Amino acid sequence: HMESVGRTIAGIAPWLELGPDKTAEGKLRDKYIKMVCKGLKNSVDPHADDYFNSTATRQILVNSAFLIQGLLQAPTQLWGNLDDKTQQRLIEQWKSTRTMKPGNNNWLLFSAMVECGLKSFGNEWNFEVIEKAISSHEQWYKGDGVYGDGENFHLDYYNSYVIHPMLLQVLKVVVKYDSSYQILLDKEWKRFVRYAEIQERMIAPDGSYPVLGRSVSYRSAAFQVLGASALFHQLPSSLKAGQVRGAMTAMLKRLFEQPGTFDKNGWLTIGVCGEQPELGDSYLSTPCVYLCSLGFLPLGLPADDVFWTAPLSPWTSIKAFSGEEFPIDKFMKP
């Protein structure tokens, strides 16, 4: 069940970084911060039942990348609450993934994320790995905020599952050490925000959305970019906070209130809306579907943020199919 760990932490880390307080939610955060830190300690302890054998599978590279994505979003509450031995063991585990050659596609970003984690938490990196991931994705950019997954364009949600979020995170780390990459970071921000704008238009009035491409069992992770744009206060100028909150809430309700979404023990099932085991791929097991936690990133915004306080307003598809006035969509110029 290793594959569920990094994915889940990546999604809940911004919320946990808000830290404990005396509210009911703050007390819940305190509980989960302690659980995550204890779990991570056990995951790298060779004597613990929950130990992850770093040589067991290439999925340790994927898990490490998502885990680092989460730790970079919660440096105080998660990384800062790990003891020195656990931190060092995690760093050594991440180093072990360097023997795993990534595919010439979005997997380049998994390796780049690991190097960013090693630099951020261990003060060393192999910058060639990062440079290859950045330059390759620049070459694979197809226009209007969309990247190819490798040289070819794939009509799926990998721009949201992996590509945009990890490329943005990698560039944010890199510019701390090399300001010449600021140009590429600025360019990625524009593409990121444009993709968020597209995503908002894909959510139908009932919260459903087009089921396209592989890995659709990642459910709400399909809208990670839209949620991250809200979290980072980088929503497109065409969108109001209240309409994004409404759209994402409708999407989450449509997915998670469907009977069969959870099994009798409370674990997620494979499927888009309910249990649909035929949607499992050769690389996709039940733990993988916890990538859906990345659809909850706005929970990292405090209760007084405009995302929560702004009045609800209809999102684009509601206005469009109610005969109301709504703005036309415009492609982003290169």
Model-identified regions with their sequence ranges:
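Long, repeat-rich segments with strong aromatic
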Residues: G11, F153-I270, P277-D304
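Glycine- and acidic
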Residues: D21, D49-N53, P277
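Aromatic-lined, polymer-binding surfaces characteristic
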Residues: I12-P14, R29-W189, R201-Q224
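Alpha-helix boundary/capping detector
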Residues: Q93, V225, I318-S322
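Extreme N-terminal leader/anchor segments
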Residues: H1-K41, D45, G323-P334
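Structured alpha-helical bundle/scaffold domains in large eukaryotic membrane-trafficking regulators
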Residues: P20, A24, W79, D178, ...
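Extended hydrophobic packing segments that form well-structured cores
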Residues: L297-P334
